[in-house]
Amino acid sequence: MVKLAKTPKNQMKQKKMAPPPKKVEESEEEESSDLEESSGEEVMVPPKKQQKAAVTPAKKAATPAKKAATPAKKAVTPAKKAVATPAKKAVAPSPKKAAVVGKGAKNGKNAKKEESEEEDEDDEDDEEDEDEEEESDEEEEPAVPVKPAAKKSAAAVPAKKPAVVPAKQESEEEEEEDDEEEDEEDDESEDEAMDTTPAPVKKPTPAKATPAKAKAESEDEEDEEDEDEDEEDEDDEEEDEEESEDEKPVKEAPGKRKKEMANKSAPEAKKKKTETPASAFSLFVKNLTPTKDYEELRTAIKEFFGKKNLQVSEVRIGSSKRFGYVDFLSAEDMDKALQLNGKKLMGLEIKLEKAKSKESLKENKKERDARTLFVKNLPYRVTEDEMKNVFENALEVRLVLNKEGSSKGMAYIEFKTEAEAEKALEEKQGTEVDGRAMVIDYTGEKSQQESQKGGGERESKTLIVNNLSYAASEETLQELFKKATSIKMPQNNQGRPKGYAFVEFPTAEDAKEALNSCNNTEIEGRAIRLEFSSPSWQKGNMNARGGFNQQSKTLFVRGLSEDTTEETLRESFEGSISARIVTDRDTGSSKGFGFVDFSSPEDAKAAKEAMEDGEIDGNKVTLDFAKPKGEFQRGGGFGGGFGGRGGRGGRGGGRGGFGGRGGGRGFGGRGGGFRGGRGGGGDHKPQGKKIKFE
């Protein structure tokens, strides 16, 4: 009865470690029969020992041997599966218990105990593998020294004996000693395993039976020799773990720092590359022949300097082919090349000067733009000499050319001072050149500043007369504007008026007075509309008193008859240069609308006013200014798209809108609005995290 009372106690210990078969509780005869069955299982031991002999060197080699043994638990003994769940609190007692069992075996109470002991070692080695797995979990991140790893793999053999002792029920004396030692060792192991307790729960154990069997067959002599080393190795591992945790941030930080430094330094390197010339000995070459191709220009420049025995390392041609950079190998060659300034290259006198850094170029460009005017609506056949005759005080005239070298109808006029440029703009605005009225504007920042002042609000001495009757004459306008010093009425190629005029006054105050007193006055049956002539008007800013607000030279015509041809459409608008009708791709029939192009925005405006409520081929047409490319609203509306007020899309769904990057109607940015979020469900089901702003 004493033994039966002891047995439940041991069974409780076993529940803590590994649930044994229930046969243990019955009687001493059943225990002996269990031992006989276990001795029957011992037939498999000799082949296992052969495997062990082959794998033993790998066990002591390094950590990988340990890792190979880790998955053993599942495959060998199903009853041991539950061993992974207890904390290390129950693992630490293993060394001393192994000693007790070893002694019991050597005393030789009966022959069957010696036979069953080797099977017990199979089980305890399985559990020892779990112990090693706990340690390998701890050791995975830090690099563990080879010596402690080898020690551990050798010393771990006797571990986990307590799970086997209660299952086999050896003797009363051993059980009592085990119980006492367990109580003592539990207290000691708690302190040792406190930090690493959760390790076994983290990793599932895959089934690999072969390495487990090989590792499980270690000898009894190793059990006794390595008892003490087990505890020492645990201390070593804890120290290694603490050191590796301290070292880990230090190791990672330099890598991150290098990456960040590389990212930061990359833009700086690019900046340096673009801001400085490719060579320290570089010359800027102007007045090249734009009609030649890039390769011809490079070859000609190299030959030009090569004749003077000047070595050129590189030639870079600008996009307009009117200028470029020439790099030399030495400062001496660069100085000699400067002496060739004014010499002819491909029939033109080239201008040479030292290349400047980007900073100085920006400063020079600001100053240069302030005294340079941009002129458009020029005849395509105009020459630089003709433009110099118009602008007598011009320092330089540069025509804007296309790739073929022909004029685009635009030019830059540079003056000596900013005052001369301002004077020329006031005097020459609207002046005709070969039947075309010039449109003059400032360049660079000054142009932007003028346009921001608002159309018509900038004080100017010149007024533009819109909606002018074709029957009106300069004398009629002179009678109305008695203080006017100059009146210009642009005409088309046939000599007919274009429907607008420029009226210049002695002072800006006179022009302002005329605008206030004569606006909407009727001339030849039409009410004229007046506004100041300014760059703002050219750019299409809305005047407080009216005027078009689109910078467009194209009219959009709706309501066309199916019989209207492009030729008929073009002839219906005075001053038009081309017309096109939009047709159906499949049938080729007209869709009822088209576009009419003009040479300037003012021509388009005059034609629009002349044809307002007009008819073409019996159909009443509706006119509007065609929007330039890029000025359409991008997306927006229900269903997403690009646009909207709060994010990157419409008012629901898609990629944002009023509710951020996906759905909702809240007024939010990229994180969603009141009903936004990062999903896209529109007003129905906004997905993702809801973010509310209070």
UniProtKB/Swiss-Prot annotation:
Annotated segments matching region 5 X 7 AA tandem repeats of X-T-P-X-K-K-X: 55-90
Start-end of each Sequence repeat: 55-61, 62-68, 69-75, 76-82, 84-90
Protein species of origin: Gallus gallus
Keyword DNA-binding (UniProt): yes
Feature: compositional bias, Gly residues: 633-680
Keyword Endoplasmic reticulum: no
Positions of modified residues (Phosphoserine): 116, 136, 171
Localization per Swiss-Prot or TrEMBL: Nucleus, Nucleolus
PTM description: Highly phosphorylated during mitosis.
Protein name: Nucleolin
Acidic residues composition bias: residue spans: 26-40, 116-142, 171-194, 218-246
